[in-house]
């Protein structure tokens, strides 16, 4: 009886022990699983952190490139002033891809206007204005002004015309057509849309002047059949057309008689004295002076001219206005100055005097000062240094086998091209 009771007691104890052992084993198993889970989770988290870190390292350069792209998009165009609809004008510039025209384009675009450039690229270059292509205020049209143009504008700056001797002597008939038929078409456009037109005339209307300095009331001394007559007489006729349209049709006109101008974007081989001397000095070639070099010229920097054109367009002055720098230099002095600024060892070579080369050229700008509040402000040496820097870059551009359009040489049977 007692033995049976003991057996039952031992059996009960064993069952409890087994349950306890099983419980302990189960707890140990759960603890082990939980430990493994925690450990695996830690490894996973560390792995994820490493992966995230690796991805971050790979993505950061992409983010940097995106930031650079965004920055380049916001800085794609030069800063443009915001103008209200009332103040913003629709402006047409013929010859706007040329030397002066492209600088005028920059000025009017940065002032906040809508600018349409028309050019046949005879002497103009697309890369002079390519930094504006795509801007909502800018349009570039490949068009020759000898053909009519139909467009809605408020102002017309009529600059289209070959302006350097090799260009207009190469094609004198085209030069005459541009200055006559082209001007007629632009005046017709101005009449149709009620626009104001500014004609870019020239100091060449004074010819080889017998009056010095030249004021706007001087009629000039021009050879009507000389090698440069296609340009000189073309501009004189263009002025006559402007005032005929003003008197008969009521067209608002402005006439700027532009004197020698220089600066970046001049053609390297356009035959003008500034470009000739700079190019020759940079290449170590002799600086060619026609005659004794005692002829005088007055040179203005292109930004001064552009400011004068804008001031004249927006003024009430309808009679011709001289725009030039009255600071006069002989051609020989000018050659020596450029030699010194370039640091060139070039010699100065004297050639026989050119046909119809004006002996003196200096503007009287009293009218511009009084009626426009305008006069040149850029010192000659400062402007020349900028032009020299530009020509250095152009020569590098050419040396890298990049194509630079060059004007074709003038076909002249008698005489030579003269200092311009």
Curated annotation (Swiss-Prot):
The modification Phosphothreonine is found at residue 94. Glycans are attached at residue 316. NAD(+) binds at residues 98-100, 119-120, 122-124, 144-145, 159, 161, 178, 200, 231, 235, 261, 267, 272. SUPFAM superfamilies: NAD(P)-binding Rossmann-fold domains. Residues 41-420 are lumenal. InterPro entries: NAD(P)-bd_dom, NAD(P)-bd_dom_sf, UXS-like, UXS1_N. The active site is at 231 (proton acceptor). GO terms for cellular component: catalytic complex; cytoplasm; extracellular exosome; Golgi cisterna membrane; Golgi membrane. Its main location: Golgi. GO terms for biological process: D-xylose metabolic process; UDP-D-xylose biosynthetic process. It is found in: Golgi apparatus, Golgi stack membrane. UDP-alpha-D-glucuronate binds at residues 149-150, 177, 185, 188, 191-192, 245, 248-249. One of its GO terms (molecular function) is NAD+ binding. Keywords: Acetylation, Decarboxylase, Glycoprotein, Golgi apparatus, Lyase, Membrane, NAD, Phosphoprotein, Signal-anchor, Transmembrane, Transmembrane helix. It is a single-pass type II membrane protein. Pathway: Nucleotide-sugar biosynthesis; UDP-alpha-D-xylose biosynthesis; UDP-alpha-D-xylose from UDP-alpha-D-glucuronate: step 1/1. It is an enzyme of class 4 (lyase). Its cofactor is NAD(+). Pfam families: GDP_Man_Dehyd, UXS1_N. It catalyses: UDP-alpha-D-glucuronate + H(+) = UDP-alpha-D-xylose + CO2. Catalyzes the NAD-dependent decarboxylation of UDP-glucuronic acid to UDP-xylose. Necessary for the biosynthesis of the core tetrasaccharide in glycosaminoglycan biosynthesis. Homodimer and homotetramer. Interacts with AKT1. Belongs to the NAD(P)-dependent epimerase/dehydratase family. UDP-glucuronic acid decarboxylase subfamily. PANTHER family: UDP-GLUCURONIC ACID DECARBOXYLASE 1, UDP-GLUCURONIC ACID DECARBOXYLASE-RELATED. This is UDP-glucuronic acid decarboxylase 1. The gene is UXS1.
């Amino acid at each position: 009886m007692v033995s049976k009771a003991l057996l039952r007691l031992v059996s009960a104890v064993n069952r409890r022990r087994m349950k306890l052992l099983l419980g302990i084993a189960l707890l140990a198993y759960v603890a082990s699983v939980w430990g493994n889970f925690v450990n695996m989770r830690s490894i996973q988290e560390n792995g994820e952190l490493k992966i995230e870190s690796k991805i971050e390292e790979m993505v950061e350069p992409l983010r940097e490139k995106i930031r650079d792209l965004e920055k380049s998009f916001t800085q794609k165009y030069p800063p443009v002033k915001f103008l209200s609809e009332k103040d913003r004008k629709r402006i047409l510039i013929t010859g706007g891809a040329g030397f002066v025209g492209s600088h005028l384009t920059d000025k009017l675009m940065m002032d906040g206007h809508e600018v349409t450039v028309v050019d046949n690229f005879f002497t103009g270059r697309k890369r002079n204005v390519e930094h504006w292509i795509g801007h909502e205020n800018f349009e570039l049209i490949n068009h020759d002004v000898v053909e009519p143009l139909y467009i809605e504008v408020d102002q017309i700056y009529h600059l289209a015309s070959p302006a350097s001797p090799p260009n207009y002597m190469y094609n004198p008939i085209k030069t005459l057509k541009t200055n006559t038929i082209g001007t007629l078409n632009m005046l017709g456009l101005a009449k149709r849309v009620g626009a104001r037109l500014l004609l870019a005339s020239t100091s060449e209307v004074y010819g080889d002047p017998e009056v010095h300095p030249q004021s706007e009331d001087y009629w000039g001394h021009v050879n009507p059949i000389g090698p440069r007559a296609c340009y000189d007489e073309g501009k004189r006729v263009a002025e006559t057309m402007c005032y005929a349209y003003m008197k008969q049709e009521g067209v608002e006109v402005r006439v700027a008689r532009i004197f020698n101008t220089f600066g970046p974007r001049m053609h390297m081989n356009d035959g003008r004295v500034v470009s000739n001397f700079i190019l020759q000095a940079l290449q170590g070639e002799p600086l060619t002076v026609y005659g004794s070099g005692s002829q005088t010229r007055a040179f203005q920097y292109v930004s001064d001219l552009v400011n004068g054109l804008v001031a004249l367009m927006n003024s009430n002055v309808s009679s011709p206005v001289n725009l030039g720098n009255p600071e006069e230099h002989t051609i020989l002095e000018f050659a020596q100055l450029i030699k010194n600024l370039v640091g060139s060892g070039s010699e100065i070579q004297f050639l026989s005097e050119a046909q119809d080369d004006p002996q003196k050229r200096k503007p009287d700008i009293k009218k511009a000062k009084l009626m426009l509040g305008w006069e040149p402000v850029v010192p000659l040496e400062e402007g020349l240094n900028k032009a020299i820097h530009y020509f250095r870059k152009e020569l590098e551009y050419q040396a890298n086998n990049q194509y630079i359009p060059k004007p074709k040489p003038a076909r002249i049977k008698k005489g030579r091209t003269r200092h311009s």
